[in-house]
Amino acid sequence: WWTLWRAIKPELERLAADETRFAGVTSLGVDEHIWHHGDPRRKGPRELTGMVDLTRDEDGRVHARLLDLVPGRSKKAYADWLTQRAEAFRAGIQIAARDPFRGYKSAIDDELAEATAVLDAFHVVKLGTQAMDEVRRRVQQDTTGHRGRNGDPLYGIQRLLRAGAENLTD
């Protein structure tokens, strides 16, 4: 491992220092990554903030491309990364996708004033599913007086409610 690392590290550092990788980014995504790999007693960041290019190609498809990872999960970690980018990069960002973490929204408001902040699709679906489950549980409790049990109609339709329309049949 160490022999391989010594061989590729200079090239990785050269690529990481190349600012041209930020050219043409108009849609920027940010999300955290919790690092669980390896021995938990080892040093190093446990939470990382990842920035991803979500710009669509000429066919309208997104080919998500990792731009960078920085230690921490905070407004400061993201805002510092943004301020280290060129003004032209920040001015070119039209859409800033994020998870519901308020710190990322604050950094976008402070550093990407012209960008439209949106929740990423994963978190929109997750929040919608959670809201639907809460309503289903509340209706179950109000109508039957107990939590859902096997055989209860609202308990039995959980998977149906979570299924995508493309997976449903008549």
Regions from the PLM with identified roles:
Residues 9-13, 56, 113, 130-140, ...:
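Non-catalytic alpha-helical coupling and interface elements of nucleotide-dependent molecular machines
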Residues 2:
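Key DNA-contact positions within bacterial/archaeal DNA-binding proteins
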Residues 6-97, 102-107:
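RNase H-like nuclease fold core
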Residues 69-72, 124-127, 134, 156, ...:
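Generic structural "secondary-structure junction" signal
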Residues 99-102, 109-153:
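Conserved beta-strand -> loop -> alpha-helix junction used to position metal-binding or nucleic-acid-contacting
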Residues 145-170:
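Accessory helical subdomains and C-terminal extensions of nucleic-acid helicases
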